[in-house]
From Swiss-Prot:
Protein name as annotated: UPF0434 protein BARBAKC583_1098
InterPro entries per UniProt: Trm112-like (IPR005651)
HAMAP family listed in its UniProt record: UPF0434 (MF_01187)
Organism from which the protein derives: Bartonella bacilliformis (strain ATCC 35685 / KC583 / Herrer 020/F12,63)
SUPFAM superfamilies linked to this entry: Trm112p-like
Family per similarity comment: Belongs to the UPF0434 family.
Gene Ontology cellular component terms for the protein in this record: cytosol
High-level lineage: Bacteria, Pseudomonadati, Pseudomonadota, Alphaproteobacteria, Hyphomicrobiales
Residue stretches spanning the membrane: none
Family annotation (PANTHER family): PROTEIN PREY, MITOCHONDRIAL, ZGC:162634
Amino acid sequence: MTTDPKMLELLVCPITGGNLSFNRKTQELISLKAKLAYPIRDGVPIMLASEARPL
């Protein structure tokens, strides 16, 4: 996934509604408030709490 700043502005954590950051190394979207990492599969962010891993 490319880290388009506009895309990151639009995406929010589905649990907290807070901002997300992109972890280039793990290819995940990180919610610091929820302490969760959302996976990106085939370039598509999976924004389901059930698919997120705890930080």
